[in-house]
Amino acid sequence: DAQEXKRVLGQLHGGPFSASAKYFGQAHGGXEK
């Protein structure tokens, strides 16, 4: 699942910082929140 992969990547690179996870998710997931 694309969302799950984005979420995992966001966690790996952003850790507990939702801002980093969100940014990483946007970079790889396009316009989705």
From Swiss-Prot:
Instruction: Describe the function of this protein.
Output: Suppresses expansion of husk leaf blades.
Name of the protein in its database record = Suppressor protein HFN40
In its UniProt entry, the species of origin is given as Zea mays (Maize)
